[in-house]
Amino acid sequence: MKNGWTNFVIGTVRIRIVGKGIERFLNNCVRQQIMISNVHKVDGQLATATILLKDVKKIRILIRNADCKIYFIRGRGFPFLTKRVIKNSGFALGFLSFFIILGLLSNMVWKVEISGAEPQTEHQMTKQLAKIGVKRGEFQFLLESPEKIQRYLTDNMNNITWVGVEVRGTSYHFQVVEKNEPKPQQKTPYQHLIAKKKAIITNLFVEKGQPLVKVNDFVNEGEVLVSGIIGNEKNKKVVAAKGKVYGETWYKSEVEVPLKTDFQVLTGNGYTKHYLDFQAFKMPLWAFNKEKYTSKVTEKVEHPLYFFKWKLPLSYEKVAVREEQNSQRVYSKQEAVEKALEIGRKKLLSTLGEDAKIKGEKVLHQEQDNGKVRLSIHYQVIENIANTQPIIQGD
């Protein structure tokens, strides 16, 4: 039995041989190709030896016709170790389950703390956090990273300027900086309406005040459109002029559109892999063999694991893999011109008031160079040009 590792896997049994025919019994074992080792003869009627577990049945048959008896002392090797483990499995499983439960509890969210926010903002933030799973009782390794949580809150809450996210063990701490809305300045009760830019008047809707212009009049920036001083010289009254004065204004825009554009698009195919990281070693948990994509986008989210408040050298990592492919958008010259006009209109309207509209547009210049179409566009816009100007006493 020179191969100790093989013997450990098969299993060995230490036996005691008692009787007069010990030597004859041992010789019979050799003839039956039963491997015997570590034979120790105490006296003429007592000896000990080691046999393989698989030869126990053969030994039982041989001992029937022998002038001696055998006693099994102990067994060693993997089969006996397995048997002992199974015998004590209840305790082992209970012990293991205890630590697994402690580990899971140590990686759950038990507290969400928000500081620096008014009660109304805090309530709103708590609801937003619950939508993405950041609440008491959730597993931390199933949540988004602090950076993504921070981005989500700033994108979905208009009343905060900044929010800091910090994970301390089983607690999530949020430090909020709210927007300081400027207090509305107390406006003077008396005011004129003046033109905020050059225009040709197209319409007037005056609620209070004395109109000083009429339709088709050309006005310059700063010119009074509706006076807050009404009445005649004998019966003069000062009011807060109120209303809307629409005028035709003019804008110029430069827009360029490439005829060919290369970009990457997601195909919709993808998968998610999960790993348990131990320093430099990464063990896959599931999603082992997945399709390899020629071009892909990979997003990794790593969550450190804790045992109570202590950070373990273990971390859970989720890797989302999405397939992407190259795509090319090609415009004809006419299509590029139409796209440029569309972009120009959208860009202009985004800078104007809600009730502004484009009356007309004209391409002043058009050229194609280096795979791009460039347009110089003139716009005619109808918009409210009225702005307020306080009336100072003594005017």
From Swiss-Prot:
Task: Please provide the Gene Ontology terms (biological process) for this protein.
Answer: sporulation resulting in formation of a cellular spore
One cellular component term from this protein's GO annotations in UniProt: membrane
Where is this gene product found?
Answer: Membrane
Q: Which Pfam families does the record cross-reference, listed alphabetically?
A: YqfD
Q: Which domain of life is it from?
A: Bacteria
| Keyword tags | Membrane, Sporulation, Transmembrane, Transmembrane helix
Q: Record keywords: Isomerase included?
A: no
Q: Does the keyword Signal apply?
A: no
Family per similarity comment: To B.subtilis YqfD.
Q: What does this protein do?
A: May have a role in completing stage IV of sporulation.
Name of the featured protein: Putative stage IV sporulation protein
